[in-house]
Amino acid sequence: MTAVLSGEADIGFMGSESSIYTYQEGANDVIKNFAQLTQRAGNFLVAREEMPDFSWDDLKGKDVLGGRKGGMPEMVFEYILKKNGINPQKDLSINQSIDFGSTAAAFSGGQADYTIEFEPSATALEAENSGYVVASLGVDSGYVP
């Protein structure tokens, strides 16, 4: 977004929330989203152990490393929770304080019961036996704008 607003780039690849934020902050040159490259979330829920019978109810009372507050990945995660009757503010603890690029390392280091990861981090956690993909947010959310 910064490169587009500063004139360093003509087109940017980002989630729709970026243009919403800049609009709400009163940007003089409003960014317009004009194309959609994906229709589903591309991230995964990773657990500490294999869970072949995973249910979203398994997250109740657990700690999860989530995404940036207000970011599309976090919004999709919370949408799935609500769709499954889980209150994101009351039924579990979502840690949004860890930088996006550091959540897999934090999880490997013992933080939280679950983490939300994109590839290649989800597969890397499985390869090092630090975590197991138990759900696809893209499958469970359905299509997202």
Give the location of each predicted region.
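Short beta-strand-centered segments that line the small-molecule binding cleft or hinge
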Residues: 11, 21, 30-37, 42
